Swiss-Prot record:
It is an enzyme of class 1 (oxidoreductase). It comes from Rickettsia prowazekii (strain Madrid E). Its cofactor is FMN. One of its GO terms (molecular function) is tRNA binding. Catalyzes the synthesis of 5,6-dihydrouridine (D), a modified base found in the D-loop of most tRNAs, via the reduction of the C5-C6 double bond in target uridines. Its EC number is 1.3.1.-. The keyword Magnesium does not apply. Keywords: Flavoprotein, FMN, NADP, Oxidoreductase, RNA-binding, tRNA processing, tRNA-binding. CDD domains: DUS_like_FMN. FMN binds at residues 17-19, 72, 141, 202-204, 226-227. This is Probable tRNA-dihydrouridine synthase.
Length: 327
């Protein structure tokens, strides 16, 4: 089983950090479906040390489980990232993850995210400063490189490991690919061969078969699932079961899905409040209902609704209609 420092994961299937997706309530939900580790949304380190409302909300964690208390930080200033890491440790974080993989122009333009892969000396300073600042494990998530001519993930992983970083996750694309083409799981094997710390494969892992193939081709210790869980938080459980038994675990029934989405919806409203919670919940409602009969009409209706009680009633009405149609 994977160990990050002295923290042992119960599963080698991990939830990826995703901006505006992996908030506290979504992480709680996916953790209940058996994720070995759940990671917060990316948090800008400078905003963190300034204690902006948004950054403080993003770093909220579950204190009862160290594998639910992993906070991802982004930035390019070693001292600022180190200070933000220490702040999170003081607030209860058990793992700090460093973002060296985000390809977004806004992030890269600030010389953070995957832009850091272009400056190995700066990367080393960030690793060293962060590891020195905290007593908890530090991990990093990166891409295979900036472009096809600079696929330096193996080198950067070595620098990270030599600096005391305890786990490396690699998304199998370059920054210049963004999310186009296919994830190069084979290249991740070169990272695995370069270091002795755990290596996690990420990218295009959307079902059982791809999860198994990613592990086999990469030789990685585990996999990280991202966009595949949109509307399917139970996918983590299905993948873990398949990797363990070789058997496919069915998705929840429509009735069970209604229960999941209703509880998730209630949690969002309780956490964010009505005015903020409803817009946040809408994107999850869209993902949950995708592919169900008459879901397009349902989504159009919900997107125009603002009253939280009315939205909840509409969710129940829609899922009941799907169940009736299946009788």
């Amino acid at each position: 089983m994977i160990k990050i420092g002295n923290i042992e994961l119960s599963s080698n299937v991990i939830l990826a950090p995703m901006s505006d997706v992996t908030d506290l309530e979504f992480r709680k939900l996916v953790k209940r479906f058996g994720a070995g580790l759940v990671v917060s949304e990316m948090i800008a380190s400078r905003a963190m040390i300034m204690k902006s409302r948004q950054s403080m909300q993003k770093c909220a964690i579950m204190h009862d489980d160290p594998t639910s208390a992993c906070v991802q930080l982004a930035g390019c200033e070693p001292d600022v990232i180190a200070e933000a890491a220490k702040m999170n440790e003081d607030m209860g974080a058990k793992i700090i993850d460093l973002n060296f993989g985000c390809p977004a122009k806004k992030v890269v333009g600030g010389y953070a995210g995957s832009a850091l892969m272009r400056d190995e000396q700066l990367a080393a300073k960030i690793f060293e400063a962060t590891v020195k600042a905290v007593k908890i494990p530090v991990t990093v998530k990166m891409r295979i490189g900036w472009d096809d001519n600079t696929r330096n993930a193996p080198t950067l992983a070595k620098i990270a490991a030599n600096s005391g970083v305890q786990m490396v996750t690699v998304h199998g694309r370059t920054r210049c690919q963004f999310y186009s083409g296919n994830a190069n799981w084979d290249f991740i094997r070169t990272v695995k061969e370069a270091v002795k710390i755990p290596v996690i494969a990420n990218g295009d892992i959307t079902n059982f078969a791809k999860a198994k193939e990613a592990l086999q081709r990469s030789g990685a210790d585990g996999i990280m699932v991202g966009r595949g869980v949109y509307g399917k938080p139970w996918l983590i459980s299905q993948i873990a079961y398949y990797l363990k038994t070789g058997k496919e675990k069915p998705a929840p029934s429509i009735a069970e899905q209604l229960d999941i989405i209703t509880k998730h919806y209630d949690a969002i409203i309780d956490y964010y409040g009505k005015s903020v919670g409803v817009p946040i919940a809408r994107k999850h409602i869209i993902w949950y209902s995708n592919g169900l009969p008459s879901s397009a009409e349902f989504r159009c209706t919900v997107n125009l609704m603002k009253d939280p009680i009315a939205v909840k009633e509409k969710i129940a009405e829609f899922y009941m209609s799907v169940m009736d149609a299946n009788k």
